[in-house]
């Protein structure tokens, strides 16, 4: 893994890297633990939450978070996420307004963020790649035990939760996969299960009556 450049506009140290394995090559985003800025409400180790988000997306059969793993790099342990070749002028709001055929993908992202307790779903954290696939990125501040949801995705508020989403959320009420739970504290795992139960019992996407749950 070789660092190419530092990514601009990131609050933590974030690097574009080239990854080589035999004849295979790709680019990734490397976020080392040493480059994290201290936060009052999250312990150090945001890189592990990036990996947990990917593992949760896989466990829920959503496939909306790019492949993300723990790796040792030039600046020590960090997360490495597959680099998405995104259409740069697309974001959540443009996709919602102009691509109704992708609304189900956005609904899945909305449900994922509730279960993961995402505190930072900005419009630019929703990508559209050159193959017209929707991706969710930047999950370092997810999975807090206290409910901290902050997101721009409120357009589906009040809609009935689709059965296909209920089917992938309900199993989390009983058990959180080890690939996720081993990256979180026991309190965070229990809170994840409570959020899964809450959205399933409610049967609908929540409405933000306060107008304050935005990143």
Regions found by a protein language model. Name each.
Residues 1-97, 101-119, 123-124, 130-137, ...:
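Conserved ATP-binding subdomain of kinase catalytic cores across diverse folds
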Residues 6, 43, 129-215:
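C-terminal catalytic region of ATP-dependent kinase domains
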């Amino acid at each position: 893994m070789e660092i190419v450049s530092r990514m601009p506009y990131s609050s933590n140290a974030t690097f574009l890297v080239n990854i080589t394995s035999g004849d295979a090559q790709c680019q990734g985003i490397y976020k080392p633990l040493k480059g994290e800025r201290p936060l009052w409400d999250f312990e150090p180790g945001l890189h592990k939450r990036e990996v947990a988000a990917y593992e949760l997306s896989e466990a829920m059969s959503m496939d909306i978070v790019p492949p993300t793993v723990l790796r040792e790099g030039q600046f020590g342990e960090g997360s490495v996420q597959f680099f998405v070749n995104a259409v740069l002028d697309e974001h959540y709001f443009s996709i919602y307004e102009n691509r109704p055929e992708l609304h189900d993908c956005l609904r899945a992202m909305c449900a994922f963020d509730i279960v993961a307790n995402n505190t930072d779903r900005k419009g630019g954290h929703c990508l559209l790649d050159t193959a017209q696939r929707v991706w969710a990125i930047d999950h370092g501040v997810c999975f807090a035990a206290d409910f901290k949801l902050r997101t721009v995705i409120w357009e589906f508020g009040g809609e009935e939760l689709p059965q296909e989403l209920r089917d992938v959320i309900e199993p989390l009420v009983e058990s959180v996969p080890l690939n996720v739970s081993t990256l979180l504290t026991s309190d965070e795992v229990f809170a994840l299960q409570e959020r899964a139960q809450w959205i399933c019992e409610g049967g609908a996407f929540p409405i933000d009556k306060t107008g304050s749950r935005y990143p």
